[in-house]
Regions:
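Short, small/polar-rich loop/turn modules that mediate ligand/substrate recognition or access, typified
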Residues: 173, 178, 248-250
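Catalytic Tyr-X3-Lys loop
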Residues: 83, 99-118, 137, 154, ...
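Catalytic loop of short-chain dehydrogenase/reductase
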Residues: 137-160, 165-174, 185-188, 220
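Short C-terminal tail/terminal secondary-structure segment
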Residues: 4, 146, 226, 238, ...
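Alpha-helical segment proximal to the catalytic Tyr-Lys
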Residues: 126, 170-171, 246
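A short, exposed helix-loop element centered on a Lys and neighboring polar residues
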Residues: 121-122, 166
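Substrate-binding pocket helix/loop in short-chain dehydrogenase/reductase
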Residues: 72, 90, 96-98, 102-110, ...
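Conserved glycine-rich cofactor-binding loop
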Residues: 9, 16-17
Length: 264
């Protein structure tokens, strides 16, 4: 499928691994001029090199923590006028015990998963509306719609992000700019592996990956019957970044193998 974005400038914030990397690969394959950010320099540089060689694409790595003002400024300087903005920001460490959550932990969660994406969008939206074309996609989490105690530090702030984008998306749609959210469920990523310890804490389990995974699959039925890979999300992310998605506005698209049962 031709996404009709060849030559466009695209940012993938958090593009060195996991769902961000998989999405970046799809964008590079589509022929965009790609900018990817991440905090870890070595993995970021390797990702940029591999994608550039594989797809013959221009891939610029930007070492930056998008949850900080300094990190965002580095991004803004490196790519001042993108056509496409995709964002995934690693959330705070999971915590399965609500009694252990402190005000400082809440502030960190909000700064990372709410203020960070909002400030990036707020910076780039005026240019997109002026140019009468733009695509913005937030890769968040299905716990924004489906609360889970062991995802307590991720879900609430992301729910606020969904509320924000629902309003803003309708303000900018008339200018040819679309804004949507993807809400992934359980994917095999580094973040999933790191969540097993708080998951064990929340349910009184041995902190062992096999034990926790067996418990999760038994108690959180995924109709599809498996945990997803990042490549299971990337095609939808790329579609939302494309010319083909011009009539998709303000949507929260759940990609979870059917785990979250809802008609909306």
């Amino acid at each position: 499928m031709d996404l009709q974005i060849k030559g466009r400038k695209a940012i993938m914030a958090g593009g060195s691994a996991g769902m961000g990397r998989a999405t970046a690969e799809r964008l590079a394959e589509a022929g965009v001029e790609l900018f990817i950010t991440a905090r870890g320099e070595d993995r970021l540089m390797n990702a940029a090199k591999e994608m550039s060689e594989k797809y013959g694409a221009s891939v610029t790595p930007i070492v930056a923590d998008s949850s900080t003002e300094a990190g965002r400024e580095a991004l803004f300087e490196a790519c001042p006028d993108p056509d496409i903005l995709a964002i995934t920001i690693k959330p705070p460490a999971p915590n399965g015990n609500f009694l252990k959550v402190t005000p400082d932990m809440w502030r960190s969660s909000i700064e990372t998963t709410l203020i960070g994406p909002i400030e990036i969008m707020r910076h780039y939206i005026p240019g997109m509306t002026e140019r009468k074309w733009g695509r913005i996609v937030n890769i968040a989490t299905f716990s924004a719609k489906n609360p889970m105690i062991w995802r307590l530090m991720s879900g609430p702030a992301r729910s606020a992000l969904l509320n924000y984008t629902a309003s803003v998306s309708r303000e900018i749609a008339e200018h040819g700019v679309t804004l949507n959210n993807l809400l992934p469920g359980m994917f095999r990523t580094d973040g999933f592996n790191e969540s097993m310890e708080p998951y064990a804490d929340a349910f009184g389990l041995e902190p062992n990956m096999d034990v926790c995974l067996a418990h999760f699959m038994e108690n959180n039925k995924i109709p599809a019957g498996f945990l997803a890979d990042p490549d299971d999300l990337a095609p939808m992310a790329a579609l939302l970044c494309s010319e083909l998605s011009r009539f998709i506005v303000g949507q929260n698209i759940v990609i979870d193998g059917g785990q979250h049962a809802s008609i909306f």
